[in-house]
Each structure stands twice: as C-alpha cells, then as structure tokens.
C-alpha cells in the first residue's frame, strides 16, 4: 500500500475513534467505545484507552516529560509516584528538567527517571547488604548505556543488539563515577552499583550531564549512605566571550570552550573542559566559566532535595560500630609506630620511584610486624607492648597500648589473638596509607618541601627529543622524572577519519589519540583483558587537548593517528601523552601553530573537624604518583602559552572549594610554560614539506580545481578512471562537489584532493589528474596511445583521457611514403598535434608535429576535380583485415595505394572503370 494511502486511512480511523465510534467495514453497525485522547502522528503511545481493553495506564513517554503533559501518576502496590519538575537556563536556553521515582525499578535501593527536554534516562542505585571485608577502597561501579532506540536506530551489529560499551559510554561512566565517589562516607565498604540507561534522546543535550543528575537523585532517595545530592551542568563560551548555561549541541560546536561541571552547594566535585578552537582560552575566561557552571549546577540540587524529602528512604549506618572502633584504633597504632620512620624516609628526598617504593614497603612490613608482636605480648588491656624499636624509630607506647585495648574490647572478651588479628588485618593497608599521607602533609605545611625534595612549584627534570624512530611519519620521546612517553604520529587522508555514531557531537574526528599503559611501565606483570576504562579516559583527555590545535580540514585535509605509549609511569602519564603527542605532530609536519604542554596540579589540605572548612592548603605542581595517591586532588590542565585547551579534575575529599581551583589555574600556567620551553628546545616549530624537512616516508597532499564538466571524465564509468589512477600511483583521490560561482568554468568548479604516501607518488598522480583537469588545447602536441584501429586511421587516447581520430592522411606529409613499417599497432604511443577539439570531436595530426619536407606540394583538393583515394585499413585489427595485408593493397603486395604504371596514384573513377572492364 502506498504510504500516502496508508496515512489517509489512519487519519480517517483516528477521526472515528475520536468521535467514539469504530465502524465496521460494511458500515452496517458501529461499536461504541470510550473516547480517547487524540492520537499522535507517530502511533498510539499516548492513548489513554483503546477498544478491546487496553489499560488506561499512561505511556512512559508522556509521564517522563514535564508535569504539564503527564497524566496523574498511578499507584502500584501501595507505592506513590513522586515527581519534581523545574525549568532551568536563560530565556534562550530554558530547559524543562524532571525527576520521577516510584514508577519503574521500584525494587532497587533507589531509582529515578530523569528528563531534560526530551532526553530521558533511567538511573538506579543498589548496594550489597554487608560490607566487603577484603575491599581496600570503596567498591563503586558505574555503568552507563545509550540504547540505540533512544535516537531512533536499530544497532548495526550482527545480532542487532547493543554491543560492548562504546568509548563515549565509557567516558560517561568515568564522569558519573568522579562526580559521585567523593560524597560516599569514609568507611563505607559495601559494594555499590549505579546504572544509567538513556531511553530517549532529543540529540540536543549531552546525556552524560543528565546521567550525573539522575544518578545523584537515585542515591538521594535510596537508603545508601551518601552525602549528596550533587548537581551537574554544562556551559559554553561563545566567540564574543558570553557564557551560555545548558547549551544545545549546536551551541557547543560553534563555541570556543565547553565545560562540564559537577559540584555540591559550595564545592567542586568534577570538571571536564575542552577548547574548540586553536590557541585555547585564557585562565580568566576559564575561571568565569567555572563560576557560571557552579551556579548552573546548584540549580539541579534543590529539585533532588525536594524529591528525597517526598520519597526518600532512611539512610542505613555506614558501618558496624565495632568495625569503626577497630579501624580508628588501628590507624592510631600504625601512625604512632610509623611516624618517626616515615619522617626520616621523606627527609632522604629519594628521587627514584622504585628505590623509594622499596623502602616504604620494607617500612610497612616492619610496622605490621611490630604491631603483631605487640598484640601477642599484650594479653589483656592492662599489658603494655614493648616500646623499643629500630634505631631512629619514635614509638608512643601508650598510643599503641590504648589502640590494642580498643581492638580487644571491640572484638569481645571471648576473642582470641587469631580473631583479633583477623579483625585488624582488613584495616592495616588503609591505616598505613593514612600514616603516609599524614606525615607527607605535615612535611609540606612545615617545611614547604615535598617527598622528593622539590619545592611546591618545582617540576621534575625534563627531557624531550623528536625524530626518535625511523620510517614513521613523526615520533617523539618525552620524559618528566620517572614518567616517560613515546609517541608516534601517522598521517592519513580524510578517508581515514573515525566515523562516530553518537546522539550528540560531531559525526567524525580527524585526530585519534590512542593511549597505552602497559604493565611494565609500573613494574607489574601483565593483566588480562582489553583496554581499561583508564586508558580510554586518559587517551580521550589527551586527544581533546590536542584536537583544537589542528588546522581546519580546508587548510590541512588530513587525518592523524597518535600512539602514546607510556613506557614509565610515576604520575601524570596522560599529561606526558599530551606533550609527546604535540612534538610528534610537529615532527610529522602537521602545521600546528604552537606546542601544547600539560601539567598536573595536586593539593593537600587541612580541614576543621567540626565544620569541615579548609583551614590550610598547598598546591603541588607536577605531582608524582605517591602525591596523587596520598593527596586530595589531581587537576590536569593542558594548553599553549596563550590559553587552556583541556581540563580534567579528580578529587578525593567531598569537593574542592572553587577559589582553590582558580588559584591552581595560575600555578599550572607557570609550570606549563617551563614544560613548553623544553619541548621547543627539541623541536621549535612544525617541520615543512616544502623545505624538505619532513620524513621521506611522510605522505603528501595536493589540491586543485577542476571544471565541473570534467568531473565525470575524471571519475569514469563506474569509477573506472579514478580507480585506475589510484591503483597505478598509490595515491588516494577525493572529489568534492562543484562550487557554484567557482573560479574555473562557467558552471562552477570542483575540488580534487590528492593524498599520496610519498612525493614520487604525488607527482605522478598530480600529472595524471592535471592532464584530465586541463582542457585539450588546439595546437598542443601530446603523447597519445592507440586504443583502436579503423579502416581509415587510428583512435587515440591522450593522458587526459581525451579520445580522437588520427586519419591516415594525417600520418605523413607524403602519403606515397607510407610504408608497412609505419603502421601503428594497438597500444603503441605516438606524438600528435591537436588540430580540432570541439563539439564535432577531437582530431589529431602526426605529420603536423614536424615541418613539411622540402619541395612538398599539397595534394589537389576535391573541388578541383581531383581527390584523395579512399585508403583501406592499415595493418592491425581493422574490420575484415587479415595479418600481412598492406595499406590499400592485397596480402603480400607490400605497397601503399593502387598506382598507375608511371607511379602516380590512380583516381577512384579510373579504378572503377578498370573493374567494370574486367568484369565484361
């Protein structure tokens, strides 16, 4: 049935349903039904009731939109559906946001369906009933998936199901994790899962922002201990410097800077930002964007609080009281045993990661052994452990004694030493890290020096080199302390761009940075499995930081793949990938205007125990791995000398004050300048192909205009011509559509892009395409190939694929001198002159490529009663000709045209008379 007829039928049926009648085919009777709401064009999903007993339950699509269009939420099994709706943003970007709980996923600890415009995400949070005694950190897992149906597609997989998480989904998981994790209370070790499923997308809002808000709301209404809620927002900075809150995807693509933010009422939890144009944005602009994003995120918190107040569950206890007592006692004991020796170890200012790590591991074993000995000696709370320790150790006997007494009391009077050791075991690693962190912070605040002896603003020793590998298009090695990255750049054509299948964002990307973190870089044995989420996340951050530096595709029509191999790691390996990648791009001849450097800024703080306010803080430039583990923040900042191109914030406490982040931007700017100095010393600017500076293996590109009427000739039937050129030269050729009003031809011009693996291939391809793109001029002398032999001459093809006729009379000035040896076989090449090129076709002349011989007399014209004889087919594959036959003669005659006894050519009329006489 045609689509129009089907649509008309559905419309007629809908009108009858709306009037309350559905007539039979014959029209003899009608069945009354309950009138329904008007059916939408897409189908029946919003119909309240349907003939035949459909339930009156409203469709999810209607209920998940804002309250003005949703039906009254029904009650299921005594549970009430609660919903909170708000409108956020400015007049231009105003968006309806809703949070609903109680309709779906009611068995989860907490579940919320969040909506922003027509983007809908289902978020659920669950947790284990008991804590994991083996967990050394909080076991939180986040899963984020985008259903293909959310944006009206069927998956292109073989099974037509969604496959493993895409990179975009993995990055969204990391965003949600980093926004939620800092707000879980210390000591909570129950395995917890947060799952987000995007059910619908209007393809204008980033679902990751909605996922953070929805997951926060799900935790807020659950019984899971959590110090939220948290709000998330996205802001964009346009070319005029104006900041737009909750921008659409189109707004983001046209902006200079896009920032995704999550925070609480007064602190920042997570930041991700990227510059969209070369050069980045100044620190002042980033600070303003952070402030605007914080205000936009705060607007998301109040609706969640209202929802939790209406439908939230009572929070469970963080942990058992005995566990909490044991953990605190073990921390006190380990700190008392380790403080003095850690102070002495840090004072050594060991530069090597491996040497420092070995000493810290030995110290840890010694402390644990002493604690076990103290436990074995102290049989009851009154018995004190030995106070003697190794030389240099400072041990508080009373603290250790009190700690063991608390552990014994928490374990119970009947607990033996084995039970007590088991109770303490799960807290030892955390207690030792706490001691290391406490001593490190005291050293920073007291002396202004760090574990390896550096000052707070001092960065580790730098080393940089370019062109470290042969054959590759570009390569570099960047080293900062014990962090080292080897990068390679490979340039490809625009056919090599990565196609993206995402509801929002660009359709493809020209720069692909693949970050690798092998186990040997941290002296560990290999792990099983594919890419980790960490590798995907670090690679994406480095890629976004460098992507803005690439010229536009019109100025530099290439795709680039960067491989960043982490060969050593002691912190900030993703920032080393940015630095090494920038150098590799310049080494490959990618015309980026300036280097992109990167640095990580750490933080140590002291807080007021009563209020939680930060009383002291210190920023650490270029943090190493130990400072990342023991500190409070990892603030990764990439950019040029003039601005910031990429940002990512991870934090451990329940957020960082915004003022500290703004201060960190200036610290990073100073440190980044020193990093770029080292990079410029290795390679100050991008290498230039026109100066012969790039590798001989580097690809080349050339663009030329082509007349619109010649595009078909270049492509050929079924692409035959362009494929043959690509096959013979090794180049890749792309043809853009004609530009109306272009400089070539009245009908406009097309653009031909030629990408070749090296200069030789490029020159050959340019010559071939140039011959086709240049119209054949009358009077030009060209080399042509014989492609067919006719009775009257030869069909030739020029390098520009123009075909024309070389008549036999145009072969030689003196037709009488045409000999058998002069015949042109198929495939032979001949130099000819273009005598005609127009609507009537193209004609060539061989004889006009040279001057006529002395004494040459042109043959009489046909108008004077003469005329040239009609020649027969030359040797070759002419119709009806056999091998060995001469031009115009019999087989074996060895002559040219038919002649009189005196050698003159017989005229056609004379030959006809002779043949007639012979027949008589």
Language model features: what each stretch is:
Residues 1-77:
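N-terminal mitochondrial targeting presequence
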Residues 68-128, 316-505, 699-713, 721, ...:
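Extended amphipathic alpha-helical scaffolds
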Residues 697-699, 706-920:
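Single-stranded RNA-binding regions, centering on S1/OB-family and related RNA-binding modules
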Residues 110-113, 120, 205-224, 465-489, ...:
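Conserved phosphate/anionic-ligand binding catalytic regions in large, soluble enzymes, centered on
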Residues 70-319:
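Long, basic N-terminal domains or extensions that often function
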Residues 223-351, 585-692:
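Mobile "lid/hinge" segments at catalytic clefts and subdomain interfaces of large enzymes
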Residues 108-205, 265, 286, 468, ...:
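Glycine-rich, flexible beta-strand/loop modules in the N-terminal catalytic cores of phosphate-handling
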Residues 311, 318-322, 674-705, 763-783:
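Long, charged amphipathic helices and adjacent flexible linkers at domain junctions
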């Amino acid at each position: 049935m045609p689509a129009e007829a089907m649509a008309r039928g559905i419309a007629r049926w809908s009108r009858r349903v709306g009037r309350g009648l559905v007539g039979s085919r014959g029209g003899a009777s009608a069945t009354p039904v309950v009138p329904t709401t008007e059916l939408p064009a897409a189908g029946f999903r919003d119909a309240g009731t349907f003939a035949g007993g459909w339930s009156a339950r409203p469709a999810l699509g209607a209920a998940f939109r804002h309250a003005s269009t949703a039906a009254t939420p029904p009650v299921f099994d005594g549970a009430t559906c609660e919903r909170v709706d708000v409108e956020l943003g400015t007049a231009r970007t105003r968006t309806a946001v809703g949070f609903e709980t109680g309709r779906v996923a009611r068995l989860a600890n907490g579940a919320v369906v969040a909506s922003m415009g027509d983007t809908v995400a289902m978020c659920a949070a669950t947790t284990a009933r008991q804590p994991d005694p083996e967990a050394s950190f909080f076991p939180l897992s986040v899963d984020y998936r985008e259903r293909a149906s959310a944006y009206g597609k069927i998956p292109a997989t073989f099974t037509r199901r969604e496959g493993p998480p895409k990179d975009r989904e993995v990055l969204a998981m990391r965003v949600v994790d980093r926004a939620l994790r800092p707000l879980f209370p210390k000591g909570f070790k129950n395995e917890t899962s947060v799952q987000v499923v995007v059910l619908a997308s209007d393809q204008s809002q980033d679902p990751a922002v909605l996922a953070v808000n929805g997951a926060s709301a799900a935790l807020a209404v659950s019984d899971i201990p959590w110090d939220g809620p948290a709000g998330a927002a996205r802001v964009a900075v346009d070319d005029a410097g104006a900041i737009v809150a909750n921008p659409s995807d189109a707004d983001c693509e046209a902006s200079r800077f896009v920032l995704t933010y999550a925070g609480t009422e007064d602190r920042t939890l997570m930041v991700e930002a990227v510059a969209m144009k070369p050069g980045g944005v100044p620190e002042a602009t980033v600070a303003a964007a952070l402030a605007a994003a914080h205000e936009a995120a705060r607007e998301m918190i109040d609706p969640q609080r209202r929802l939790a107040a209406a439908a939230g569950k009572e929070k469970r206890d963080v942990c058992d009281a005995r566990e909490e007592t044991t953990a605190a006692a073990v921390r006190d004991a380990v700190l008392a045993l380790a403080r003095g020796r850690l102070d002495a170890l840090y004072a050594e200012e060991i530069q090597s990661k491996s040497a420092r790590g070995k000493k810290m591991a030995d110290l840890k074993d010694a402390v644990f052994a002493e604690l076990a000995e103290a436990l074995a000696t102290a049989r009851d709370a009154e018995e004190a452990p030995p106070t003697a320790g190794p030389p240099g150790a400072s041990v508080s006997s009373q603290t250790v004694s009190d700690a063991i007494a608390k552990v014994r009391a928490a374990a119970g009077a009947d607990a033996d030493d084995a039970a007590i050791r088991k109770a303490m075991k799960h807290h030892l690693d955390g207690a030792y890290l706490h001691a290391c962190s406490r001593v490190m912070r005291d050293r920073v605040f007291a002396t202004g020096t760090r574990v390896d002896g550096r000052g707070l603003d001092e960065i580790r020793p730098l080393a940089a080199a370019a062109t470290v590998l042969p054959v590759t298009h570009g390569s570099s090695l960047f080293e900062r302390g014990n962090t080292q990255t080897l990068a390679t750049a490979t340039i490809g054509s625009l056919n090599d761009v990565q196609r993206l299948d995402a509801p929002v964002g660009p359709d493809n990307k020209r720069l692909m940075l693949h970050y690798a973190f092998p186990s040997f870089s941290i002296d560990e044995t290999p792990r099983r499995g594919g890419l980790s989420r960490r590798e995907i996340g670090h690679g994406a951050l480095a890629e976004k930081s460098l992507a803005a530096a690439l010229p536009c595709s019109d100025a530099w029509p290439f795709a680039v793949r960067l491989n960043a191999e982490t060969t050593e790691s002691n912190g900030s390996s993703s920032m080393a990938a940015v630095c090494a990648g920038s150098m590799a791009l310049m080494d490959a001849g990618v015309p980026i205007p300036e280097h992109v450097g990167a640095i990580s800024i750490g933080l140590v703080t002291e807080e007021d125990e009563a209020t939680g306010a930060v009383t002291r803080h210190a920023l650490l430039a270029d943090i190493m791995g130990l400072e990342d583990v023991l500190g409070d923040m990892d603030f990764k900042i990439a950019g040029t000398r003039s601005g910031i191109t990429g940002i990512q914030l991870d934090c451990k406490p329940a957020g960082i004050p915004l003022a500290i982040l703004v201060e960190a931007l200036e610290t990073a700017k100073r440190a980044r300048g020193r990093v770029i100095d080292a990079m410029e010393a290795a390679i100050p600017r991008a290498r230039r192909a026109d100066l012969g500076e790039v590798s001989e293996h580097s690809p080349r590109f050339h663009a030329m205009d082509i007349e619109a009427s010649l595009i078909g000739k270049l492509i050929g039937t079924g692409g035959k011509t362009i494929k043959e050129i690509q096959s013979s030269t090794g180049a890749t050729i792309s043809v853009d559509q004609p530009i109306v009003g272009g400089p070539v031809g009245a009908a406009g011009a097309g653009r031909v892009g030629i990408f070749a693996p090296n200069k030789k291939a490029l020159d050959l391809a340019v010559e071939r395409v140039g011959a086709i793109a240049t119209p054949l001029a009358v009077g030009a002398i060209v080399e042509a190939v014989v492609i067919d032999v006719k009775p009257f001459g030869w069909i030739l093809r020029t390098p520009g694929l123009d075909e024309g006729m070389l008549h036999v009379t145009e072969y030689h000035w003196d037709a009488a001198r045409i000999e058998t040896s002069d015949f042109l076989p198929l495939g032979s090449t001949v130099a000819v002159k273009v005598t005609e090129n127009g609507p009537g076709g193209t004609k060539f002349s061989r004889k006009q490529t040279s001057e006529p011989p002395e004494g040459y007399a042109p043959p009489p014209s046909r108008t004077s009663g003469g005329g040239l004889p009609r020649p027969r087919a030359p040797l070759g594959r002419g119709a009806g000709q056999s091998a060995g036959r001469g031009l115009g003669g019999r087989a074996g005659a060895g002559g040219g045209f038919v002649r009189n006894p005196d050698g003159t050519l017989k005229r056609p009329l004379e030959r006809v008379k002779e043949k007639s006489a012979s027949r008589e």
